[in-house]
């Protein structure tokens, strides 16, 4: 996997050919009467044809057989806990915390990426192209002779344990913990693993993930475009006679059989592509004077809504950094938010709650549900000597923040048996320190 090659950039128009078949891209046009090597030309659209040029997304694929060459789709009976039913549980406004989600049992059958999808929470409706879902994947087997694609939206995948070897129609990429990848709507992919693997998925229905505007930060900072990587063209030259394609369509899974692999794209060009990003390359912005900055300064990617400055979903990280603020309570402040905050932990311990929030687990603080540092964190930070120090060293926490009110599935609230009923206790020992006279 380390030998995989990539194209650098975000939102760029790329061109790529499998090096085994040079000159496989048509010259000067997209759809010649006969394509080089007698390939089929197929356009994959990620936006309306008439979308503004700055937002128009599409890629031309040159493949051995068109994607339409398959048998009819039938309901797929795997992935029992992959759901888009937001009404199966009553609303729960409490602070929620999950202990690390289970990996597949060592003595059980192999579970691949699709079979190991479990939905935790979400909102909206993929049929109206509005909303999101948050899933956990837990797998110990590879997707042999099969592929998956999402008709409903984009997947942002956050590995927490185990390296994902992902084959897409565009080529191959390796995604390890502390890296992420995005598979846009409709792009077919397969996940191979060589050890038990677990991670988080943010699925958005509305639009695609983009880089946040930088405003007064300037032209550089946060996640820089040059650090995003898109795989180079590669096709599977095996003669596969029994292949299945799994589709997520209107919130449900379907499967179709065909007598050839979908990974037969010899060349492609366009700007609608899968990509990966190494979170260690994020350029952190922080206060160098006083006060705790809002977490929006840690935004890696965003899926914007129609309301200016308000996201359907933001992907935010809390990376290792220097903390130097003077006369300041440095950890995250106590908060009631008009947004929903789902947090996960990839590595180490989270700075505001070192106890109880473990790697592979999660928290959900719903709209206007109060949250903030636990007693240990508050007392420690209130009395700490304020010297420059490294924080979050050896850790990587992240947040999926959304303007939508998220409903928790039955699997998330009951079946997984990971919900920590004692979470609320971390705030119960907070004292009333009010003094009539100022400090």
Swiss-Prot record:
Q: Does the keyword Protease apply?
A: no
Keyword match Metal-binding: yes
Keywords of the record:
Dioxygenase, Iron, Metal-binding, Oxidoreductase, Phenylalanine catabolism, Tyrosine catabolism
What one GO molecular function would you report for this record? metal ion binding
A Pfam family this protein belongs to? HgmA_N
InterPro entries attached to this UniProt entry: HgmA_C, HgmA_N, Homogentis_dOase, RmlC-like_jellyroll, RmlC_Cupin_sf
Picking any one GO biological process from the record gives: L-phenylalanine catabolic process
Enzymatic reactions: homogentisate + O2 = 4-maleylacetoacetate + H(+)
Residues in the signal sequence: none
Per UniProt, the enzyme's principal EC class comes to oxidoreductase
CDD domains cross-referenced by the UniProt entry: cupin_HGO_N
Necessary cofactors: Fe cation
Name this polypeptide is given:
Homogentisate 1,2-dioxygenase
Specify the taxonomic lineage: Eukaryota, Metazoa, Ecdysozoa, Arthropoda, Hexapoda
Write the gene name. Hgd
